[in-house]
Amino acid sequence: MSESNIIFGKRTVFEALENDVQIDKVYIDRDNQFMENIKRKVHEKSIQISFVPIEKLNRLTKGNHQGIVATISPIKTLDLNSLEKSIIDNNFNFLILDSVTDTKNFGAIVRTAECLGMNGIIISKSGSSPINGETIKSSSGAIFNIPIFKVDHIKDAIFLLKANEIKIVSADEKGENSIYDHKFDRKTSIVMGSEGKGI
C-alpha cells in the first residue's frame, strides 16, 4: 500500500469525510471508545470500516495516527494549463513554493495558505515535498480545500502570472512585516523558498 494513499489522525480523517474525499477504507483501533462522530459519518457515506488492533495501525503508518487510519485515492494535482484557466476565472493570489522538501513544513504552509485565502499553491514536479500522509496530517486537512498546481518548472508559472499582470513578491525570514499584516494588491502572488537555501 502506497504511503501517499494513507491518511491518519482524527482531524485529518474528519476533514477528508467533510470534503467528500474518495475514501476506500477506514481502520479504527478496536479498543477506542470515542470518535463517534467519525464513525457516524463513515456509516452515512457507506465507507468500509474495520476495527483492528493498535498493532495493525502501527504497521499501516509510522505517524501519530491517534487510533484511526484511512486509505484514500491520491490527492489530485493540477497542471500549468489549469493554472491559466484559474487565472482567467479571476484567481490571482497564489503561493509559489521553490524547492520546499520537508513534508511537515509543506503541510503547515498549506494550512497557512488556506487561512490567508490563497487561490492555490504552485510546486514543481521535481525537488518538492511529496504529498503523503504526513503532509496531509500537518495541513490539518487543509490540503483538501486548496488547489495544488504541479508544474515542470517554477519559472514557467511565474512567467504566466507576470504575463497576466500579477505582481510577484517574495517571503523572507528577515522581513520586517508579517505576512498576516501586509496588505497585498488584489493581483499578487508570493514566492517562498526552501528551508535551507531560500529562493
Regions found by a protein language model. Give the residues of each.
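N-terminal positively charged helical leader segments and presequences
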Residues: 1-85
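Short secondary-structure boundary/capping elements
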Residues: 5-8, 101-104, 195
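Gly/Ser/Thr-rich beta-alpha loop segments that engage phosphate groups in nucleotides
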Residues: 11, 109, 143, 195-198
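Glycine-rich nucleotide phosphate-binding loop and flanking beta-alpha elements
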Residues: 14, 34, 58, 76-78, ...
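Conserved acidic residues
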Residues: 24, 119, 188
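RNA substrate-binding interface of SAM-dependent RNA methyltransferases
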Residues: 33, 87-177
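Short basic, glycine-rich beta-strand/loop surfaces that mediate nucleic-acid
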Residues: 62-73, 139-145, 183-194
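Active-site/ligand-binding-proximal alpha/beta "capping" segment
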Residues: 169-199
